[in-house]
Amino acid sequence: MQGKIVQLGKDTAVYGLSTILGRLINFLIVPFYANVLLPAENGVISNLYAYIAFAFVMYCYGMEAAYMRFVSTLDIGDRKQNFTVPFLSLFTTSILVSLAIHFQAPFISRCIGLNTSESGLIQYAGWILCFDTLSVIPFASLRMERKAKVFASLKLFNIVTNVALNLVFILGFHFRADGVFLANLCASAAT
């Protein structure tokens, strides 16, 4: 019993510290954006990330919780089936919805108050959602297998990659708001 409590404490510390560190790193990039990008660009970035947060919930449609429930009890199927079914479901719907977003980006841009010239940002957002969704079940699997250090390392790798690519794209290649989303897309695809 005491061993399980100690293990829970260690896992909680790893998950908690990695989450806090990740948020701190992401928080530190906000002043960079404020000093390098125009206020209008920061507004577009903020609005689009708000839409991404809402859309991510719909992209995942509760599959992470369902996966964790079924894999913890194995009421139906074995571990492999309990991984494959939700992953393929999310894979299929993510690809289809992201393709729809990609091809309807000018229309979506107008609907949310962006210029059609900014429809590339919508396309980036659609693919960010796709790649982030594809990582949901593998990350849940790491949690269920109690691989907290691997989980935290991959999450931090994603954040550090995102921040580093932001610096490269914005400072090195002089991208604007598109550099923010391209960096996020590359980081999401890498993890």
Regions found by a protein language model. Give the residues of each.
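N-terminal membrane topogenesis motif
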Residues: 1-27, 83-84, 88
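Transmembrane-helix boundary and interhelical linker motifs in polytopic inner-membrane proteins
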Residues: 2-6, 37-39, 55-90, 108-109, ...
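Small-residue-rich midsections of specific transmembrane alpha-helices
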Residues: 19, 25-29, 46-72, 90, ...
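Residue-level recognition of pore/gate-forming positions within transmembrane alpha-helices
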Residues: 19, 23, 50-53, 90, ...
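Helix-terminus/linker motif at the lipid-water interface of multi-pass membrane proteins
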Residues: 25-41, 109-112, 168-173
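Interfacial/gating helices of multi-pass transporter permease domains
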Residues: 30-54, 118-120, 177-182
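Short membrane-interface helical motifs at transmembrane helix boundaries
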Residues: 96-114
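Hydrophobic alpha-helical transmembrane segments
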Residues: 122-126, 152-191
